[in-house]
Amino acid sequence: MNPIVEFCVNNLASGADAAFAKLDADDSLDVIEYDCLTYCDLCATSLFALVDGEVVRGETADELVANIYTFLEENPF
């Protein structure tokens, strides 16, 4: 079973789409897009994803990707 990375479609439209594309190319991750993750305040102010249910944030798409991989290293599945 792979780690699950979940994105909100609205956050993708705000710039997280580049992070989604990079992570989706990684076969060791299950990357999923949802209509809404109900984190509207967070979604309106930063790029983020849920990684195995935990919020991971980034100022840019590249930083978000780096933070997700760091989170996964620090929290082995």
UniProtKB/Swiss-Prot annotation:
Signal peptide (from-to): none
Disulphides: none
Taxonomic superkingdom: Bacteria
Family classification: Belongs to the UPF0349 family.
NCBIfam families: PRK13669.1
UniProt-recorded name of the protein: UPF0349 protein lwe2340
